[in-house]
Amino acid sequence: MTNHNYKFDTLQVHAGQVPDPVTGSRAVPLYQTTSFVFNNSDHAEARFALQDPEAIYSRLGNPTNDVFEARIAALEGGSAALGVGSGSAAITYAILNIATVGDNIVSASTLYGGTYHLFSGTLPKYGITTKFVNPDDPKNFEEAIDEKTKAIYYETLGNPGNNVIDYDAIGQIAKKHGIPVIVDATFTTPVTFKPFEHGANVIVHSATKFIGGHGTSIGGVIVDGGNFDWANGKFPDFTQADESYNGIKFAELGEIAFVTRIRAILLRDTGAALSPFHSWLFLQGLETLSLRVERHISNTKKIVEFLDNHPKVELVNHPLLESNSYHALYQKYYPKDAGSIFTFELKDKDEKKARDLIDHLEIFSLLANVGDTKSLAIHPASTTHQQLNVEELASAGISKGTIRLSVGIEDVTDLIADLEQALEKI
């Protein structure tokens, strides 16, 4: 499909694929193979030299993965995409692609616990540091930028507090300083928000969540916006000749430079590859993405209203509420609403009561995932954000009494009844 005027609901079903030319299969075939036969020795040489973009080995690329990547790129409005083994791998590769020893990134402090530890604990061991800032004021990002800063990073909706950032302002700051904006858009999906239209240059997703949607597959994806000048003098790995590929200069690849370098270098050398089978499952999920997100959001709005009016609930952290400090930004960037993952706190913020409430839930499952068709609940302070200290938890918007919900697509009256009976028991 080359017509860029197709609407989202059509692209999520068709983008990146035509019926199989050999068999006529309408569904995307699963190419469950490690390797691909070359026509002759010259053909093999051309592929290894990146002169022929077709598949060599499934760690680097696979026809099933190709469809998934093209479809995601189309839905996000990007130039290219790369599927990898997990959302964490997508984030790691996005940073390692542009930063090295002595460099830093500036990141919002409101992050998923695993990402926070990647930035604060793991990447520093490789010489890459992170300056965490309160994202409520865009000036905090600008004040943290120095000559070694390689990117600004944030999540579209912070995990788990649902904070909203002034994306346009951040994009303008990054552009002024000649650095890219890398955005984790897992919680919003391309259904409700398009980061490339608001200053982003690279998007990462945990495809495990809404993209897959059914809690069956692990994977991540990196989307290249094709809208950043990697030859601006700040990124020598893109402008210096890479001798492992006969002197190629990745910046000369233009709008596909970012993901091509990850595929050619990082994926080749460190191998966090996406399984073709998982790509195939993600493609099944994508076909109903907008339909599921619509139900996720409609259910969430009713549950937020229920909890906000419950006498045992002190606070509901969702920006759709007029009382929420992010409501104005939410209205600006999400006119059709977004966010089916949110937190709430009981009246006394008691940790035991919060954990007891979760244990009393019957439909909501206690597990470490979000964006599933099934409704989920968890206690972040003791699980997903356990590695953070008290100050870091507070910076991420989490207390010992915080409960996180990921609202599924079940009948909302059943979900409210489940929450009501659990609240009655504490």
Report residues per predicted region.
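Conserved N-terminal alpha-helix of the aminotransferase class I/II PLP-enzyme fold
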Residues: 40-89, 114-122
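Glycine-centered tight turns that cap/initiate beta-strands
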Residues: 77, 148, 312-315, 363, ...
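Short hydrophobic/aromatic beta-strand micro-patches
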Residues: 223, 343-345, 406-408
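Conserved small-domain helix->loop->beta segment predominantly found in fold-type I
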Residues: 270-273, 277-279, 284, 288, ...
